[in-house]
């Protein structure tokens, strides 16, 4: 079998139809590479050739590189990998310079290697489909476009214009591609697509790439051009400020682009291959491919969903509480076409919650991303009410009131009598054990936790929490609903704080411990950023609010005392108590916390924090390791204790729910990639120096002895 069908028509035009065997999408796998080798030799041997057309037999044009292959590439494979990449690119370059017109007939999405094939053609025609996406997203997986994407995008767009598409992996549709000059024409269907490709070849028999024409200049100039040189002088520093040195891919892309712009095309392609090999054989790309590709795909395929239970769809959803979380859940549900009953204690409160959806939808309309009619249609799906009777017939009701067990019990009992037969009652709680909340329900088998993250419209993750008696059917329905509204579910078992809130708390606590130890707050925040966290722990604590943290600690302490246990006091408790009760600094919402929030200026760390500051010789690496290890070790404890049931959910949940450094591939993958044996030793060092919270869990010790990764 061949991944490329070779057909020569009566006009001596060769049509290459891309058709990977046994796959729904075309990829640059071994079969494709062998097939490209074969067709390139065949094309070179043609005595009568008028042109070449690349087209696809799949629903899309081409999906990109084979990530299953890429994740296996090790440093010892570097030479073979480099040669393989160079050979593939050599074939595309040969076809590009055959001396006949080459056309890409794009019937759908072309990403990564697929877009690189298209770029190696002289003319690109796409079907006018708003769903089609083009671009080079490799950077989001710790890689760079290694099939000529950097070289050709820079030569077609110029360095500055190409950078956002290369270093941020921005994807774009047909209209944007046309405005950039990357798509030259459109067609309405596959037949017109082929007809236009043939017609263009006949009309342009002497075609070649613009950058292969003698005297061609890169748009905007090359790195020696004064205006470009001025930008490039500060670009690396700006990039470093953004990546904090955690992500080698954007740096490699910038280097390959700038170096490649100063040499001929073939040398530039070789430079690109070297940087690509460096990234592909490195650890960070493996971390990111493992989680952002394989992990997310496993979750999409229902990895933690009970098997053999029919797929389910919610048809009417009730949301109790129209505050920030309830309003966000109502919006996320309605925008997917599901009717929502948004209930609060008064119609006025419920309408305020609905107004949140109006605000978000109005913004979409003003940006041209939605019609006014569509906005009105979505808003009509949200019924704001104070009457529990309006919940009649809901097959899912989500309680989203304040974190208070008595209040949650009250609204649950009021609402669940209106559930449809076999309906599901859910609680959006971030800390309260679901089994305890389920006691208020008439059927704890149909009760489950759905922990959304704020702001709901932007946060992709939903943590599904199984109570002690939650049935498999209820879990399957919850999983299906989360996917129905386009979000990513992870599944955990019940415990205080579950997984995400519990581990997230360790990050914030570690930041405040460092402050209590006397470390300058700016050093703490910078260490977190250098670790790869999106925001520093003190800034995050302000967002959460110190009063909420104090309240949760108080509730936890009471609950543990009722169980005959104690929550030991720590230096963090003193920091929080002082800020709230002595200094009246309660967080961002109150206008003052660890940071000051001037009305007309940027937030900045409050100078009064120097009351905790003393000489502290802690190294930056120790701070970075404390921040990463404290979360990773507690994640491992969650897995060991059965709170988490899968490493995939641990890694995906830690990144999308906690903000754990994405370069690591997640909290457990951080330990794997660190080296299990080394991770155990480092944890022991940190425990000896900073406290027992760094003591390696038994599972880490066991895996270190067995020389196995945690899987």
Per-segment meaning from a language model:
Residues 91-104:
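Conserved catalytic cysteine-centered active-site region
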Residues 7-9, 19, 72-77, 82-87, ...:
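N-terminal glycine-rich phosphate-binding loop for ADP-containing cofactors
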């Amino acid at each position: 079998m061949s991944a490329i069908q070779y057909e020569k028509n009566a006009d001596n035009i060769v049509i290459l139809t891309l058709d990977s065997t046994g796959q729904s999408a075309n990829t640059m796998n071994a079969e494709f590479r062998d097939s490209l080798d074969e067709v390139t030799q065949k094309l070179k041997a043609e005595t009568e050739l008028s042109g070449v057309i690349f087209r696809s037999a799949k629903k899309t044009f081409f999906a990109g590189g084979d990530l299953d292959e890429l994740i296996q590439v090790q440093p010892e494979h570097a030479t073979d990998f480099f040669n393989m990449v160079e050979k593939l690119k050599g074939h595309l370059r040969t076809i590009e310079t055959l001396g006949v017109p080459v056309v890409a007939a794009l019937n759908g999405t072309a990403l990564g290697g697929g877009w690189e094939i298209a770029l190696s053609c002289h003319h690109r025609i796409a079907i006018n489909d708003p769903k089609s996406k083009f671009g080079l997203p490799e950077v989001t997986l710790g890689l760079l476009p290694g099939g000529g994407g950097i070289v050709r995008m820079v030569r077609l767009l110029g360095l500055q214009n190409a950078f956002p598409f290369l270093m941020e992996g921005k994807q774009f549709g047909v209209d944007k591609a046309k405005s950039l000059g990357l798509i030259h024409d459109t067609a309405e269907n596959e037949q017109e697509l082929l007809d236009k490709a043939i017609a263009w070849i006949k009309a342009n028999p002497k075609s070649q790439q613009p950058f292969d024409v003698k005297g061609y200049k890169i748009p905007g100039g090359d790195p020696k051009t004064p205006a470009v040189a001025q930008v490039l002088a500060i670009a690396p520093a700006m990039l470093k400020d953004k990546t904090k040195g955690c992500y080698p891919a954007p740096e490699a892309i910038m280097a390959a682009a700038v170096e490649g712009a100063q040499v001929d095309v073939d040398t530039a392609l070789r430079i690109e291959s070297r940087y690509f090999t460096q990234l592909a054989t490195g650890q960070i790309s493996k971390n990111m491919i493992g989680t952002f590709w394989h992990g997310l795909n496993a979750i999409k395929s229902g990895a933690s969903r009970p098997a053999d239970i029919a797929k389910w769809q919610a048809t009417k959803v009730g949301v109790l509480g129209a505050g920030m979380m309830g309003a966000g859940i109502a919006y996320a549900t309605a925008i997917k076409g599901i009717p929502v009953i948004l209930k609060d204690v008064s119609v006025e409160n419920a309408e305020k919650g609905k107004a949140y959806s109006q605000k978000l939808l109005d913004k979409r309309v003003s940006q041209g991303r939605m019609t006014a009619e569509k906005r009105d249609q979505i808003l009509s799906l949200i019924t704001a009410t104070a009457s529990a009777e309006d919940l009649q017939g809901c097959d899912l009701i989500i309680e989203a009131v304040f974190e208070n067990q008595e209040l949650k019990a009250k609204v649950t009992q009021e609402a669940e009598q209106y559930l449809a037969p076999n309906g599901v009652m859910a609680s959006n709680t971030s800390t309260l054990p679901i089994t305890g909340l389920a006691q208020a329900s008439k059927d704890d088998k149909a009760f489950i936790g759905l922990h959304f993250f704020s702001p709901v419209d932007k946060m992709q993750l939903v943590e599904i929490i199984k109570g002690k008696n939650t049935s498999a059917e209820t879990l399957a329905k919850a999983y299906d609903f989360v996917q129905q509204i386009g979000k990513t579910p992870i599944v955990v078992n019940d415990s205080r704080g579950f997984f995400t809130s519990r581990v997230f708390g360790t990050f914030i606590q570690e930041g405040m411990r460092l402050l209590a130890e006397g470390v300058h707050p700016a050093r703490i925040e910078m260490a977190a950023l250098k670790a790869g966290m999106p925001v520093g722990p003190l800034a995050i604590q302000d967002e959460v609010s110190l009063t909420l943290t104090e309240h949760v600690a108080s509730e936890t302490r009471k609950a543990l005392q009722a169980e005959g246990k104690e929550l030991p006091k720590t230096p963090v408790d003193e920091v929080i108590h002082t800020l709230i009760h002595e200094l009246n600094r309660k967080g961002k919402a109150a206008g003052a916390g660890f940071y000051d929030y001037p009305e007309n200026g940027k937030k900045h760390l409050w100078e009064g924090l120097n009351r905790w500051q003393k000489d502290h010789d802690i190294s930056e690496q120790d701070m970075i390791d404390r921040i990463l290890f404290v979360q990773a070790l507690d994640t491992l404890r969650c897995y060991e204790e059965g709170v988490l049931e899968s490493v995939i959910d641990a890694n995906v949940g830690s990144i999308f729910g906690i903000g754990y450094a994405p370069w690591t591939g997640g909290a457990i993958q951080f330990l794997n990639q660190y080296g299990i044996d080394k991770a155990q030793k480092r944890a022991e060092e940190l425990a000896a120096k900073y406290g027992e919270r760094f003591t390696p869990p038994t599972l880490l010790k066991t895996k270190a002895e067995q020389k196995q990764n945690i899987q």
